[in-house]
């Protein structure tokens, strides 16, 4: 049997499917997620239910968002899960997660995310950060390094700034390729993202922050002066106390927020 077949389902490359099969890793992830009935528990991409089963067994109801119609059909017919699951067939990138929130209950979101959509999905989920208690995701190890990076490092970029603006970022564990069927060509890791209840650096317009960081990091090797000259002058950088000769990866999240707020105030 092909190593791309697991429990009778053939992994689909276009959906980025790699199914988690290592029970030790599964148990550690479920422990980190800490399922409970006080939150709306939401899984993105349940796949073949490696995380779905142990989480659903610990709670009354689990909401899942799955794109693959074949996998949705399997979940709908699953002997022990079908009565516990609230299944939404569709694309998580387009999904309105706010519809899942109940009065007095925030979401806990988790999933073994398809690596080909993990970054845009993060940006989509940040839009619902105020309604989320925490998130636990299996990601490409490189993405976890980017999420948790410090200024001045190669991994630090637009994703870092936006993630750390919205959330505390904590790597949980590293997962080798052999923990999956089929094994991915890259190492994986689990990360915990905890949205701030009160943001350390409030931004007046998050869209402006997103635009400014995208513009700054479009050309990483150039200076802020070069990349942001249409938005902030040398005199204005001086007013902000930011060295315009620095490169984008040398600027802290707090400084990016200060620049975005400055641009908003100028408009």
Swiss-Prot record:
Q: Which Pfam families match?
A: RrnaAD
Q: SUPFAM superfamilies of this UniProt entry?
A: S-adenosyl-L-methionine-dependent methyltransferases
Q: Which InterPro entries match?
A: KsgA/Erm, rRNA_Ade_diMease-like_C, rRNA_Ade_Mease_Trfase_CS, rRNA_Ade_methylase_Trfase_N, rRNA_adenine_dimethylase, SAM-dependent_MTases_sf
Q: Name one GO cellular component term.
A: cytosol
**In which compartments does the protein localize?**
Cytoplasm
- Gene3D superfamilies listed in its UniProt record: Ribosomal RNA adenine dimethylase-like, domain 2, Vaccinia Virus protein VP39
Domain of life, per lineage: Bacteria
Q: What is its EC number?
A: 2.1.1.182
Q: Which GO terms describe its molecular function?
A: 16S rRNA (adenine(1518)-N(6)/adenine(1519)-N(6))-dimethyltransferase activity; RNA binding
What does it catalyze? Answer: adenosine(1518)/adenosine(1519) in 16S rRNA + 4 S-adenosyl-L-methionine = N(6)-dimethyladenosine(1518)/N(6)-dimethyladenosine(1519) in 16S rRNA + 4 S-adenosyl-L-homocysteine + 4 H(+)
Can you tell me which residues bind S-adenosyl-L-methionine? 18, 20, 45, 66, 91, 112
Looking at its record, which EC class is this enzyme?
transferase
Keywords (A to Z) from UniProt: Cytoplasm, Methyltransferase, RNA-binding, rRNA processing, S-adenosyl-L-methionine, Transferase
Which chain positions lie within coiled-coil regions?
none
Function text: Specifically dimethylates two adjacent adenosines (A1518 and A1519) in the loop of a conserved hairpin near the 3'-end of 16S rRNA in the 30S particle. May play a critical role in biogenesis of 30S subunits.
Q: Which family does it belong to?
A: Belongs to the class I-like SAM-binding methyltransferase superfamily. rRNA adenine N(6)-methyltransferase family. RsmA subfamily.
Xref: PANTHER family: DIMETHYLADENOSINE TRANSFERASE, DIMETHYLADENOSINE TRANSFERASE-RELATED
NCBIfam families on file = ksgA
- Protein name per UniProt: Ribosomal RNA small subunit methyltransferase A
Please tell me the species this chain comes from: Shewanella woodyi (strain ATCC 51908 / MS32)
Provide the organism lineage as a comma list.
Answer: Bacteria, Pseudomonadati, Pseudomonadota, Gammaproteobacteria, Alteromonadales
Q: Which gene encodes it?
A: rsmA
